Amino acid sequence: MGRRFIQTLILLVVLGFPGLPIMAETGNGVATDQAKWIISSGTSASLPSGSLLSLALALERGAETVWLDLVLSKDNQIVLLTDTRIDQLTDVKEIYPDRSRPDGSYYSFDFTLEELRGLSHLPAAPSGSVSATSLFRSHLPVTALDDFLGYLDIVFTELAARPTLICTLKHGWLHQQEDKNLGAIVLQALEDYQSTKANASVVIASYDPEELQQLAQSRGAGQAEDIGFMQLIGSNNGEEVQRLEFGTLQPYSYDLLFTRFGLKSVSSSADSIGLDPQAV
């Protein structure tokens, strides 16, 4: 493993899981005058993660790195959502009450981009709070990756520097069951983006080691070689990755990745590692 790989691993273990905002702040969540946002997914006391408004606020506050959770729509468009199951994230139950699957859940890849854009994020604040009530009355639409990148280009001149984008592939294994290759589509989109933005800093992150290895092997030449790869490690509860074994889905175990062999395998495809707190 290279020195950069080891240093990044230590940094992420110390800071904690970068899927949450990492910043200097007071106990009540209010940033101090000395606060400096390092990594943010846009989550705040009232704004849901991945909404354009929350990401704009993170950039305005000086976030140097923006964490983007990505899923696919029915028409293979990349959307900013923290989960493929969208009934806990949006008002999809109200807009499309008859579109759930037999398990009762609503999935991003059952809706076109146009349909997803018509949905509103549910407020991050507890139900009944002033901020939650105010947000619920407004329309905070689901955002496509292209929309965010377009917004970033517009405000770039107002920023101190173009932020690093950590693009996290959410539930690639579940997309595969729908004959959708989330990783390949995201990689192509980011390669196209980097080809026109020479100073763009982009990282693709995944909880699935096999998915990341396949992407690393298929990465193109030229500027796309500058795209970084981050191996995320979560708990063994199957929340992020599952494998089909003997006809049933089973939680993926990360135990092997904590061995010398596992780390060597990861270092062949990843530039860095991000650990969930419960995995430390």
Q: For the regions a protein language model found, what residue spans apply to each?
A:
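Bacterial N-terminal signal peptides
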Residues: 8-18
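Phosphate-group recognition and catalysis centered on beta-loop-alpha active-site segments
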Residues: 20-280
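Bacterial N-terminal signal peptides that target proteins for export
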Residues: 1-9
